[in-house]
Amino acid sequence: MAALDIHQAIARAQAEYVRCIDDGDLAQWPDFFTAECTYKVTTADNHRRGMPGAMIYAASRGMLADRVASLRDANIYERHAYRHLLGQPYVVSADGGEARSETSFVVARVMRDGSTDLFATGRYCDIYAVTDSGVKLRERIVVCDSSRIDTLLALPL
């Protein structure tokens, strides 16, 4: 896949990913990942220091599906929705069947009572599996700018 095509494929995948979350279609969220994948939400400080700690960690698409099932059926949390704003993906590298990118994000949280607040800012550090049919996330590290993370981190970022 040519460099421009990879950039466009990643930008489209990013748009579809946040639309899925923002529209509440969480059952489809694991489909953006390869079967063997990593999803991690961490702080910029932990990421910079190479610390393994994470607020959310999953090591496979099955673990992501389990998270969605628990959000739907088991966890008790105040219902809310997200609205993502994304920067353009920056393709760090692309060779063979893999592409690495970074994308800045801002997430607003909308509560049931209608109140809206700035929930998280940061960047996605991604590794994509690249095939002729498109791209899928092999690894997504969500690096939050702040070390102050709200305890209501239920939905995926």
Each PLM stretch: what is its role?
Residues 1-25, 31-35, 42:
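Short, low-complexity N-terminal intrinsically disordered segments enriched in polar/charged residues
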Residues 8-11, 20, 55, 62, ...:
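A generic "alpha-helical surface" signal
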Residues 17, 29, 64, 101, ...:
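Hydrophobic pocket/interface hotspot
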Residues 17-19, 72-79, 112-115:
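Short helix-to-loop capping/linker segments positioned immediately adjacent to catalytic or ligand/cofactor-binding
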Residues 27-28, 84:
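A short glycine-rich, hydrophobically flanked beta-strand micro-motif that places a catalytic Asp/Glu
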Residues 35-104:
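A solvent-exposed, acidic/Ser-Thr-rich amphipathic alpha-helical stretch
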Residues 81-85, 90-157:
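A beta-strand edge to alpha-helix "cap/lid" segment located at domain peripheries
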